[in-house]
Regions:
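Transmembrane beta-barrel wall of Gram-negative outer-membrane proteins
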Residues: 243-373, 388-404, 422
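Periplasmic N-terminal accessory/gating domains of Gram-negative outer-membrane beta-barrel systems
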Residues: 83, 90-99, 112-206, 216, ...
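Cleavable N-terminal targeting peptides that direct proteins into the secretory/outer-membrane pathway or into
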Residues: 1-22
């Protein structure tokens, strides 16, 4: 009756495939001497001391085991009258078929097990366009970046260590990343010690990757072990270089609850866990082979205190002292300054296997990074103002796999079944990814960006010859008519707590303008008085201004990051899929629901000061021309002068 139900399900469901992060093991069991296939032989797979799945061969000695979580397994074949053979370390990759034949020898040392070490084939029969890297291979590589591991595959280009990859000429964003079947948004966030394998597909993409235009990088995390084990890793370069690379990693795995065997001993694990994590602190994440040039500390301190010098022609104003530095004022340093990165990521998984046909996995990853980002523009004079960025990603998932068919079926019944390897998988996941980009000192206090102090402008009326008409009386006045307002004094009250380096430009400019008795644009005397904002000539800085660059090559000292931004991306996914084998044909079906939510907020706060200067008093810039105010003396005699009040708009 059960088989009839399976048949109906298989016929009703169409082959619309949803993603399943599992692999398949196929092969033939045969006699070592004669080469004849062995029907009804038992084949099982084990990992970490747990028997995870098994089957029997058909009349042709063929077997198929699926679904199998990607990883390394021991494959064991047994049959009455033959020596047991076990192949260790067989690699099962996601969405691929691994072919493994076994040959049994009849009647030789039946009590012994022949153990053979698996050898990775040079050519993968089910994936000629890609490659799989195992945990052992990943650890042996001189990198901890998933993209860098993937770049060792033919057809993949990577510009530099840790950068995104280009697959067969496609753009970087055409590469899709998956972790345990979850499409990645944000950081991958899996510690190296928690990676079971990385599978790269560069061509011939399966149907479930319908939205991938470049290639696929699929990461499978490690699962629990039947025995407790743990590891600790510590790395540091602080004694040998200035990059100060420091890393601490750990991994823990083991059973929480085990089955009881008939004899009372503990059997395979029912509930198991795996937990891994890494913390990394490094001062320079991308060192230069030739070092970096920077201005010397004592020279920088002098520039901050004395940013200007008088021009040879004093009437030309001032020149920036940064433009007169020589080679002796610079030094080459091994590591970039103020580019520290702190990163923490942890990955965990709980596996439940109450029966041989039911499997539930719950897990997640957490990734957090805070860094000061390198800027070539600020590297020479103002690396202290490098941007601060942060990223936080967490990912949760749950997956249920239910196989059909009893493990207690007879060999004949199992091998002759029309429908085999029937199962369904239900998976749900949620991802949250957040970014921030700010100035480290001001963050979201927007009005502190570029603030150097308080400026006050003093004005007086400006007159010119002409006529004025009183609209209410029709009287026409001739004489000196009020035509506008002119600046008479421009003062600066320095802020001594925020952006001191920027404020020093303005303080020094006001002081030198007075010391050298320069003339204002709106003055006639060389009295050293600044009367209008135009007198600053782009050297004395107003709120929101940045200093002039050094030969258009580097930002001058005090150049700060002008940005404050937040970004959040979320993803919720639900998938269900099923599969069954009818003879040598596989029928698969499923669906996938994915919902994304993207939000971003950001601005260049220093630009607000320019807008505020344009908008301040905008409503009283005009004169009330309809209501002139003629000036009369005490005797009522017109003084040939007409004033206007401001017109409020």
């Amino acid at each position: 009756m059960l088989r009839k139900i399976y048949s109906i399900v298989a016929l009703v469901c169409f082959s619309t495939f949803a993603f399943a992060q599992t692999g398949t093991l196929k092969g033939v069991i045969s006699d070592l001497m004669t080469g004849e296939p062995i029907p009804f032989a038992n084949v099982i797979i084990e990992k970490g001391g747990n028997q995870l799945a098994g089957t029997t061969t058909d009349f042709d000695g063929k077997y198929t085991i699926k679904p199998i979580e990607p990883g390394n397994y021991n494959v064991k074949a047994t049959f009455v009258g033959y020596q047991t053979v076990e192949i260790t370390g067989v690699i099962i990759s996601a969405n691929k078929i691994t072919f493994q034949d076994l040959k049994l020898q009849e009647g030789v040392a039946l009590g012994e097990i022949k153990i053979i070490e698996y050898k990775k084939p040079l050519l993968d029969q089910d994936n000629l366009s890609g490659e799989t890297k195992t945990a052992e291979e990943i650890v042996a590589l001189p990198t901890r970046s998933v993209s860098s591991v993937a770049s060792t595959t033919a057809g993949i280009y990577q510009k530099d260590e840790g950068d995104a990859v280009n697959m067969r000429g496609s753009r970087e964003n055409a590469t899709s990343y998956y972790v345990d079947g979850i499409k990645v948004r944000g950081a991958i966030g899996v510690p190296t010690s928690g990676i079971e394998q990385i599978t790269v597909v560069t061509g011939g993409l399966p149907a479930q990757y319908g939205d991938a235009t470049g290639g696929i990088i699929s990461v499978t995390t490690k699962g629990p072990s039947n025995k407790f084990f743990g590891g600790l890793e510590v790395e540091s370069s602080s004694l040998f270089d200035k990059y100060n690379y420091n890393l601490v990693g750990f991994g823990l795995s083991g059973p929480i609850l085990k089955k009881r065997n008939a004899d009372g001993t503990k059997g395979s694990s029912i509930i198991g866990y795996f937990l891994s994590g890494e913390y990394r602190d490094v001062d320079d994440t991308d060192p230069s082979a030739i070092g970096r040039w920077k201005v010397k500390d004592d020279v920088l301190k002098d520039l901050q205190a004395n940013p200007f010098r008088i021009a040879p022609n004093a009437s030309a104003g001032f020149l920036s002292n940064s433009d007169f530095l020589t080679e002796d004022d610079f030094e080459n340093v091994q590591a970039k300054l103020n580019t520290n990165e702190k990163r923490f990521n942890v990955s965990g998984k709980l596996d439940f296997k109450p029966t041989n046909t039911t499997f539930l996995s719950l897990g997640g990853t957490f990734y957090s990074r805070t860094s000061r980002d390198f800027s070539g523009w600020r590297s020479m004079f103002s690396s202290a103002n490098n941007r601060e960025s942060s990223q936080t990603t967490y990912r949760l998932f749950g997956k249920l796999t239910q196989k059909f068919g009893s493990q207690e079926e007879s060999e004949d019944e199992s091998s002759s079944a029309t429908i085999k390897n029937a199962f369904f998988t239900i998976q749900g996941d949620y991802t949250n990814n957040k970014y921030t980009f700010v100035d480290a000192d001001h963050e979201y206090d927007l009005f502190k960006y570029g603030y150097v102090g308080e400026f006050n402008t003093y004005k007086q009326n400006i007159y010119s010859g002409g006529t004025a008409v009183d609209s209410s009386t029709g009287i026409i006045y001739t004489g000196q008519i009020h035509s506008g307002w002119g600046d008479t004094l421009y003062t600066f009250d320095e802020n001594q707590y925020t952006n001191v380096d920027l404020a020093n430009y303005t303080r020094a400019y006001f002081q030198m303008f007075d010391d050298y008795g320069l003339s204002s644009f709106v003055g006639t005397e060389n009295d050293g008085v600044i009367r209008t904002a135009a007198d600053l000539r782009g050297q004395g800085l107003r709120n929101g201004d940045l200093p002039a660059s050094v030969y258009s090559l580097y930002g001058n000292h005090g150049t700060m990051y002008n940005g404050s931004a937040k970004q959040e991306n979320t993803q919720t996914t639900f998938k269900a899929s099923g599969s069954a084998d009818i003879k040598d044909h596989e029928f698969s079906f499923g669906f996938e629901f994915e919902q994304r939510d993207d939000s971003y907020w950001g601005m260049g706060p220093m630009g607000m000061w320019g807008l505020m200067r344009q908008l301040t008093n905008k409503h009283i810039l005009q004169r009330d021309l309809a209501n002139p105010k003629p000036v009369f003396d005490a005797n009522g005699v017109y003084q040939d002068t007409v004033n206007y009040d401001r017109l409020f708009v």
